């Protein structure tokens, strides 16, 4: 009986739209071959094998969907890259990076025992729990991509640290969370929810201007397709380091939070 790579067979059977998608499904543990979970896209299987695809959640948490949106919007490929994930928590971002072929991910979080067991057992993941990223002077190696999904801390505190970790030409994908950037008074007034477009613009301009001063060049900015806790709007910013902004910051912010929406 002839054999074929599993990822190729998934596409031929119409169970995946592309080999890249097939590889992500396999690496996420969502594919069974004759009833057994397969974890290697290159696995050689007989062409008449029984294939099952579990199309449940792609990632261990909804955070992975946020990063997925950024990778698609900015056309970023984490394949074979050394990455760091700040605020890893359950591991949604880390999972997304791995499923897109990251060579290694430093999963950093102040909590303990939160990272999903699947990721803990993945040899590509370096678990750095009970670790506050702001105090990490250097990682064991330079990274080419840093992702940030941090809570209760401003990006203005983290960005000066991240630039030390990055290799020249490295990139950062960061969730900008107005509830942690607008200040205690604004957050308290809205019971932890920042709803005013005026404040969204103010926060974004503040963070992006600071990033520019630190040598980060803004390459793209989009609104996250998923809301944060309590319904907070969040934004995904793409930076390169070192670099300059691709356009006027005020104009880039206005595209994401239009001025006509002001109260």
Q: What positions do the PLM features span?
A:
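S-adenosyl-L-methionine
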Residues: 103-157
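A short glycine-rich, Lys/Arg-flanked "PGG" loop and its adjoining helix->strand segment in the class I
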Residues: 156-173
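Conserved class I S-adenosyl-L-methionine
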Residues: 79-89
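Flexible, glycine-/basic-rich loop-and-beta segments that form/coincide
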Residues: 233, 240-263
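Short, glycine-/aromatic-enriched active-site segment of Class I SAM-dependent methyltransferases
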Residues: 178-195
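Conserved S-adenosyl-L-methionine
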Residues: 96-104
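A basic, amphipathic helix-loop patch mediating RNA/tRNA/ribosome contacts
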Residues: 1-49, 82-83
């Amino acid at each position: 009986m002839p054999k074929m790579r599993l990822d190729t067979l998934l596409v031929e059977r119409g169970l995946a739209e592309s080999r890249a998608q097939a590889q992500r499904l396999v690496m996420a543990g969502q594919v069974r071959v004759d009833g057994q979970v397969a974890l290697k896209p290159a696995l050689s299987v007989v062409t008449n094998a029984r294939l099952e695809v579990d199309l449940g959640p792609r990632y261990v948490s909804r955070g992975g969907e946020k990063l997925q949106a950024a990778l698609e919007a900015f056309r970023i490929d984490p394949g074979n890259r050394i990455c760091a994930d700040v605020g890893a928590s359950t591991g949604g971002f880390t999972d997304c990076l791995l499923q897109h072929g990251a060579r290694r991910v430093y999963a950093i979080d102040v909590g303990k025992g939160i990272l999903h067991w699947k990721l803990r057992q993945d040899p590509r993941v370096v678990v750095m729990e009970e670790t506050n990223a702001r105090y990490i002077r250097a990682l064991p190696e330079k990274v080419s991509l840093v992702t940030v999904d941090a809570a209760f801390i401003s990006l203005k505190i983290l960005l000066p640290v991240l630039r030390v970790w990055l290799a020249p030409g490295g990139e950062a994908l960061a969730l900008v969370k107005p509830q942690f950037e607008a200040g205690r008074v604004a957050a308290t007034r809205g019971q932890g929810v920042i709803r005013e477009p005026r404040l969204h613009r103010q926060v974004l301009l503040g963070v992006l201007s600071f990033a520019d001063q630190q040598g980060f060049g803004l390459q793209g900015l989009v609104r996250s397709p998923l809301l944060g806790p309590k319904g907070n709007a969040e934004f995904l910013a793409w930076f390169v380091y070192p670099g300059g902004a691709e356009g006027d910051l005020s104009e880039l912010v206005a595209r994401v939070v239009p001025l006509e929406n002001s109260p």
